[in-house]
From Swiss-Prot:
It comes from Homo sapiens (Human). One of its GO terms (cellular component) is endoplasmic reticulum. N-glycosylated. GO terms for biological process: positive regulation of canonical NF-kappaB signal transduction; positive regulation of sprouting angiogenesis; regulation of glycolytic process; regulation of pyruvate kinase activity. This is JmjC domain-containing protein 8. Its main location: endoplasmic reticulum.
Amino acid sequence: MAPASRLLALWALAAVALPGSGAEGDGGWRPGGPGAVAEEERCTVERRADLTYAEFVQQYAFVRPVILQGLTDNSRFRALCSRDRLLASFGDRVVRLSTANTYSYHKVDLPFQEYVEQLLHPQDPTSLGNDTLYFFGDNNFTEWASLFRHYSPPPFGLLGTAPAYSFGIAGAGSGVPFHWHGPGYSEVIYGRKRWFLYPPEKTPEFHPNKTTLAWLRDTYPALPPSARPLECTIRAGEVLYFPDRWWHATLNLDTSVFISTFLG
């Protein structure tokens, strides 16, 4: 079975996964639980566990993505991001949801608990991105300060930029289709997130209102090897760096908790 077909077939099981607290260590989000999307073995993004700042600037910062391992310890932040703790601390706080399409024009405000308990479910593969609500970005840093102050961002900055956080939680099979912006990092706290990346000069073939899941089903299988993106699955505790203006799309293989650090 082709890689994309295998991912989609295994995703289908996610739609019948039962709610629950999950095994110890999953924070109650059930990553890797029954029906989670299988992790595709193909990875064309380099992983580095011993990267120095000089190497980062010379080899990656302006050139290509890289996956960073072991540079920070966010175990405290991870513990605070368990399902029960987030609901206890922020359940009644209003959060702003965006549509999971390229431009994300439409916004919806509702209590965080309502999002987690009623909207956080596996992606319907027939839904359009502009019909799918997604909690990512638009964070209220005043109301959520007690959480964000415990996060340790990647230590490598870029001259003339300042970091800005964007925190999110999304269901299995969800994601954002191809788009680009400035450089940044994305760390998975719980779950797994698959990334697809193209350099600025190589515009991918995609529809801005179709989901990444639809792109994986309809477009990815027909791509010749020379037209395939860089891709890899980022697991809990790993950080992906993407350079300025690189096209990227994401697919959450589990219900995933994640945080990005944009360098603006």
